[in-house]
Regions:
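Sec-dependent bacterial lipoprotein signal peptides
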Residues: 1-21
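Bacterial lipoprotein signal-peptidase II cleavage site
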Residues: 22-29
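Post-signal peptide N-terminal segment of mature Sec-exported envelope proteins
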Residues: 29-51
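A short beta-strand element within beta-rich, extracytoplasmic domains
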Residues: 62-79, 168
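Short, surface-exposed beta-strand/strand-loop-strand elements in extracellular ectodomains
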Residues: 79-98
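Acidic Ser/Thr/Pro-rich low-complexity disordered segments
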Residues: 93-115
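Cysteine-clustered segments with highest specificity for TGF-beta superfamily mature ligands
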Residues: 114-168
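Short, low-complexity, Pro/Ser/Thr/Gly-rich segments in the mature regions of secreted, periplasmic
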Residues: 165-177
Length: 177
């Protein structure tokens, strides 16, 4: 994951520099990646973030907005299907923002968090188009500009174990103005 974020940050930095020269949005393809978690369940109005922020090199030119789009295939052992979730992002340290330290993760009240997607419903083995940074593309940009970001999820329905999210054909659309 760190290698992917480092590579993505470098590509986004290059994209931002090129977009600054052309004053046009730039589209950058990203490498495929996967995220695996042991278990997922209804978070009851809470957003769960990883304990540590994703960290990467800051771009040479600040970016204004970033939208990520592509395909996601979710595989899991269902306890209760489907998994229904919304993705969120934050740049402020959850520990300084009134979130609860749950050991391996931070738990924050969804009402105070910033969504970066609509709601998605994932059946086991299903592939679907997703967009992160719509709404609120500036949150992803702020994270890239600061060199760290937490990306989490609120699960509103479903429960599963052995969950893997395979992100493929991902593209970053970057604007600097």
């Amino acid at each position: 994951m760190k290698t992917l974020l480092r590579t993505s940050a470098l590509l986004l930095a290059l994209a931002a520099a090129l977009a600054a020269c052309s004053k046009a949005p730039l589209t950058v393809p990203l490498e495929d990646f996967s995220i695996s978690v042991d278990a997922v369940g209804n978070t009851a109005g809470q957003v769960v973030y990883p304990k540590n922020a994703a960290q990467f090199d800051r771009p040479v030119v600040d970016v204004k907005t970033i939208r990520l789009s592509g395909q996601v295939t979710v595989s899991y052992t269902a306890v209760q299907a489907p998994l229904v979730m919304t993705f969120y992002a934050r740049t402020a340290d959850p520990g300084a923002a009134g979130c609860t330290d749950a050991g391996l993760a931070w738990i924050c009240d969804a009402a105070g968090e910033t969504p970066i997607s609509g709601e998605y419903s994932f059946a086991n083995g299903e592939t679907q188009q997703v967009t992160l940074g719509d709404p609120n593309p500036e949150v992803l940009a702020d994270g890239i500009n600061q060199g760290r970001i937490w990306i989490g999820a609120e699960v509103t329905s479903g429960a599963a174990t052995g969950v893997t999210f395979d992100f493929t054909q991902m593209v970053a659309e970057v604007t600097v103005f």
